[in-house]
């Protein structure tokens, strides 16, 4: 996985107003992705959560025809918003949700 720069984060998620953003994306052949965002307000975080949901939907549509075996990861994507923070994780298994749920 590679860390995305600010321009890529904005292109992928439509988020340009985060106080902090860290996004790691796979090479493109797989769907794994993790993103953490921090915002000034809960309203901004809620908006980013909706943008993340749209990102996952778009990825699902792309992978259905490109690499269909990756769709399960997208179907089980974890998107959590707590206060001013948003976390997104696309990976195998339930571990991601269990780990993120401890912090969100």
Question: How would you describe each model-predicted region?
Answer:
Residues 10, 32-36, 58, 62:
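Aromatic-anchored, charged helix-turn/loop surface patch used as a conserved interaction hotspot
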Residues 1-31, 43, 47, 74:
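Short, compositionally biased low-complexity segments enriched in polar/charged residues
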Residues 6-9, 45, 49-53, 93, ...:
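Extracytoplasmic/secreted envelope proteins and their assembly/folding machinery
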Residues 45-82:
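Short Gly/Thr-rich strand-loop-strand
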Residues 39, 60-65, 97-104:
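Hydrophobic transmembrane alpha-helix bundles
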Residues 33-41, 85-89:
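Second-shell loop/turn segments in exported
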Residues 70-104:
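A short, solvent-exposed beta-edge/loop patch
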Residues 1-3, 12, 57, 63, ...:
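Subset-of-secretome marker
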């Amino acid at each position: 996985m590679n860390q995305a720069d600010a321009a890529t984060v904005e292109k992928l998620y439509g988020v340009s107003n985060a106080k902090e953003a860290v996004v790691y994306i796979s090479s493109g052949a797989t769907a794994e992705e993790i993103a953490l965002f921090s915002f000034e307000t809960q309203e901004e975080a809620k908006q980013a959560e909706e943008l993340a949901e749209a990102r996952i939907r778009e990825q699902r549509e792309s992978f259905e025809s490109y690499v269909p075996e990756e769709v399960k990861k997208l179907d089980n994507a974890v998107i959590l918003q707590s206060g001013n923070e948003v976390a997104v994780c696309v990976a195998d298994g339930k571990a991601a949700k269990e780990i993120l749920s401890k912090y969100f």
